[in-house]
Swiss-Prot record:
Keywords: Isomerase, Rotamase. GO terms for molecular function: peptidyl-prolyl cis-trans isomerase activity. It comes from Corynebacterium glutamicum (strain ATCC 13032 / DSM 20300 / JCM 1318 / BCRC 11384 / CCUG 27702 / LMG 3730 / NBRC 12168 / NCIMB 10025 / NRRL B-2784 / 534). Pfam families: FKBP_C (PF00254). PANTHER family: 39 KDA FK506-BINDING NUCLEAR PROTEIN (PTHR43811:SF19), FKBP-TYPE PEPTIDYL-PROLYL CIS-TRANS ISOMERASE FKPA (PTHR43811). This is Probable FK506-binding protein.
Amino acid sequence: MEKPQIELPVGPAPEDLVISDIIVGEGAEARPGGEVEVHYVGVDFETGEEFDSSWDRGQTSQFPLNGLIAGWQEGIPGMKVGGRRQLTIPPEAAYGPEGSGHPLSGRTLVFIIDLISA
């Protein structure tokens, strides 16, 4: 798959995690707390500015779900290898409220994630 273009949702930022399957995979299913390998791109909901992309680094990222932001811990399980999913994550499920010490705290984030292995 190629790097996706994110189409930002219209309207105000959601207060809860929004999960949207773009492509439903047919491979192994990601499990809560399991290890995953993904390609992803993330943008700021308000500005549309891209802040991170494994695609731009030219390599996938692999990590245990329990070490990630809550929005990923909740939004990736159930996804199947080969799938592409968009997560719209409010601050509370990302890096916390504004002033929490992370450059993205207080921001609603939008990610498109391709599940490579689970």
